[in-house]
Amino acid sequence: ILMVITAVASALLDNFTTMLLMTPISMQIGIALGINPLALIIPEVLASNVGGISTLVGTPTNILIGAYAGIGFNDFLINQTAGVILALVVMGGYVLYHYREEWRKRGGGISPRLYRKLEQNAEIEDTQALWKSGLVFGLVLVGFILGERVHMVPAVSALAGATLLLIWLNPNIHEMIKAVDWTTLVFFMALFMVVGAVQEVGLIGIAASAMSRIIGENLILGIFVIIFGVGTLSTTIANIPLTASMLPIVKFLSTSVPGANSLVLYYALSMGAAMGGNGFLIGGEANLVTAGITEQTDSPISFKEFLKVGLPVTYLTLAVGFLWLIIRF
């Protein structure tokens, strides 16, 4: 159930934010049930990385791909969701098998004292702000879905929602400006400058030509190379710069490989980048933020423990994603 909740939340928010919310909750649930909280948290991290693939806003890599290739919110939803659901089912089966002994240890129930503490922690401090934010969030999602019909890019819906919420909630503007993640914004600007420079000097063209010679006119081979190649690299390389570097290469292949004009290689890139992040603890932002939270508790996530679950899940889900893209396209 927690995996499903995490996957759905990651599709609507993003996996980084979802794990910030889910990790403390799962820690308390694990303690209440008398089991190792990591038996809940690690599957949630894996589900968050996969669940976000199904929408434009679910992962930073999808946002990059969507903006570069002109793929909209509905396109991701239609072409990726079924594959994501299949991957989550396979992942759930493996996780159930892996943690079967741990989950059998769960205690008989929650003590009244702990239950009261959980209730206190779950108490909503500002219900007005909650329902206002929920309403605006719903309107933004509607804008994502319907905006494509009037050729409105998703950024317009997001900015309109943010503006409306600022006016409605009237927060401290100075505090809001301080809260903006300027480091990430500057990182993205610098990243695209570097990718553009590499493209201008011809290095990306050389890489694209080499991959084109390997793939030839075989679309299935192209999907395989992209999804498994990017997925393997994403286990150790941050998937955002990797995706940004791969975009011009995928664009070249989409024009040279017969049948690739359906944008299937972009979807393969999306799946490979996100699913590959499950391989190692350093493979994704959600992994690292979750590890950082658990580091402050008695149940920190170790590199080895994450690897034992994450690496098999990575290649199982990559295989499911590969088969789905072949069926879909």
Where are these predicted regions, by residue range?
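Small-residue-rich segments of transmembrane alpha-helices in multi-pass membrane proteins
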Residues: 1, 44, 48-55, 113-121, ...
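Hydrophobic alpha-helical transmembrane segments
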Residues: 1-4, 18, 41-42, 77, ...
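Generic alpha-helical transmembrane segments of integral inner-membrane proteins
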Residues: 4, 8, 85-97, 134, ...
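Membrane-interfacial helix-loop connectors
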Residues: 9-45, 60-79, 181, 196-299
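Juxtamembrane and boundary regions of transmembrane helices in multi-pass small-molecule transporters
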Residues: 35-38, 42, 54-57, 74-125, ...
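Hydrophobic alpha-helical transmembrane segments in multi-pass integral membrane proteins
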Residues: 56-60, 139-145, 191-209, 276, ...
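Membrane-interface junctions of multi-pass transporters
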Residues: 117-122, 147-152, 167-222, 234
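Flexible hinge motifs at transmembrane-helix junctions and intramembrane kinks/re-entrant loops
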Residues: 127, 131, 139-159, 175
